Amino acid sequence: MAGYLRAVSSLCRASGSARTWAPAALTVPSWPEQPRRHYAEKRIKVEKPVVEMDGDEMTRIIWQFIKEKLILPHVDVQLKYFDLGLPNRDQTNDQVTIDSALATQKYSVAVKCATITPDEARVEEFKLKKMWKSPNGTIRNILGGTVFREPIICKNIPRLVPGWTKPITIGRHAHGDQYKATDFVVDRAGTFKLVFTPKDGSSAKEWEVYNFPAGGVGMGMYNTDESISGFAHSCFQYSIQKKWPLYLSTKNTILKAYDGRFKDIFQEIFDKHYKTDFDKNKIWYEHRLIDDMVAQVLKSSGGFVWACKNYDGDVQSDILAQGFGSLGLMTSVLVCPDGKTIEAEAAHGTVTRHYREHQKGRPTSTNPIASIFAWTRGLEHRGKLDGNQDLIRFAQTLEKVCVQTVESGAMTKDLAGCIHGLSNVKLNEHFLNTTDFLDTIKSNLDRALGKQ
């Protein structure tokens, strides 16, 4: 199974035993130089490196094409390469994931290919040492920040919500709540209590949650002021960057203390740090109840940032993706509270079903656009940090080429299915296979850049 992976042991540090992450103790490893490639001399020079995180399965194959055919022929950039493919994560005891996050902290920009988060079946398939955690979760825990998902709009791809004529960016607070909760099943009558024991030695506080007359379920969850504050800063900075209004949705009428804390921290930070900039850009910030917000989103035309708690963001981001047409047309960017560190990736997974077909030697029609946008969003941000207008223009041109290619009628099967219905589409009449579609984008990009 690991045969599809390139040998990259020289690029990633191997670790003989599992290691615990401690920021003060770990340093970013040194990398050998990438092998020299022979490209045209008139490439855009990028002064500072970009961290590249490779991935798994079909997206890994597409990722290589994007890098070698669309990016590097036009951009002279040093890539700090990390192989986050599952076999290498297993070989390094997941140290490679930690190292990639620390490198992102150092260089401020990372682009990431989709990766496998193993379950029991994957542990058996890859003969893993253990069921490794989600690499995205590991990276987010080190970097902090907020995951922003935004649709890529193509005029000819029908939207389930036709009124959404402008993008809606959803900012998910990817920390705590249900995803770090302790939940349990009780099988008899008893009392469920929550206890908080202060570190300063003062008296413990106790809350009685429920007296169970019989079996049931319970849960305790948390979040922190520090994490909520980082979430708020990321959202306000992103809104200013996009020049779009920001809405925070909670259910503070029910969770008066828990969700109320989100509402209060956002308002305090807005008033203290961002109100002037929002007024200058003629945008606004509002808190809305989640049920009211969902209704308003459906009635809106788009053009705003929606800040969601962890679970809400998980659910609503998929609703937005389908509402705009396809998960294959959805970008995902992790923005850190410092306002300069980001990690860009596709919002979808590794496309396992297509990879199984690829293993059998059969052609697939896999949509690469979200993976291309991972590169463009990362490079555009690198350009903004470095003041490199040529790099910014290149990234924006490649994005426009992708959209214009689809709007011209050249697309993959998933997008053709949105127009004609999957049961009605035919190869080369309604859609192209993966390679032909990527070749079409390459030709259109070369033409747009005046390379032909």
From Swiss-Prot:
Cofactor notes: Binds 1 Mg(2+) or Mn(2+) ion per subunit.
Stimuli inducing this protein: By oxidative stress (at protein level).
GO MF terms held by the record: isocitrate dehydrogenase (NADP+) activity; magnesium ion binding; NAD binding
Subcellular location: Mitochondrion
InterPro entries: IsoCit/isopropylmalate_DH_CS, Isocitrate_DH_NADP, IsoPropMal-DH-like_dom
Organs and tissues of expression: Predominantly expressed in heart, liver and kidney. Expressed in activated B lymphocytes.
Amino-acid positions noted as binding NADP(+) in the UniProt annotation, renumbered to this chain: T115, I116, T117, R122, K299, G349, T350, V351, T352, R353, H354, N367
GO cellular component: cytosol; mitochondrial inner membrane; mitochondrion; peroxisome
Residues annotated with N6-acetyllysine modification: 45, 48, 67, 69, 80, 106, 155, 166, 180, 193, 199, 256, 263, 272, 275, 280, 282, 384, 400, 413, 442
Post-translational changes noted in the entry: Acetylation at Lys-413 dramatically reduces catalytic activity. Deacetylated by SIRT3.
Residues that, per the record, bind Mn(2+): D291, D314
Key words, A-Z: Acetylation, Glyoxylate bypass, Magnesium, Manganese, Metal-binding, Mitochondrion, NADP, Oxidoreductase, Stress response, Transit peptide, Tricarboxylic acid cycle
Annotated site (Critical for catalysis): Y179, K251
Pfam family, one: Iso_dh
Chief subcellular location: mitochondrion
Binding site for D-threo-isocitrate: T117, S134, P135, N136, G137, T138, I139, R140, R149, R172
Residues recorded as bearing N6-succinyllysine in the entry: K80, K106, K166, K180, K193, K256, K282, K384
Catalytic activity field: D-threo-isocitrate + NADP(+) = 2-oxoglutarate + CO2 + NADPH
E.C. numbers: 1.1.1.42
Subunit structure: Homodimer.
Family per record: Belongs to the isocitrate and isopropylmalate dehydrogenases family.
PANTHER family: ISOCITRATE DEHYDROGENASE [NADP], MITOCHONDRIAL, NADP-SPECIFIC ISOCITRATE DEHYDROGENASE
Job description of the protein: Plays a role in intermediary metabolism and energy production. It may tightly associate or interact with the pyruvate dehydrogenase complex.
Name this polypeptide is given: Isocitrate dehydrogenase [NADP], mitochondrial
Gene source species: Mus musculus
Gene: Idh2
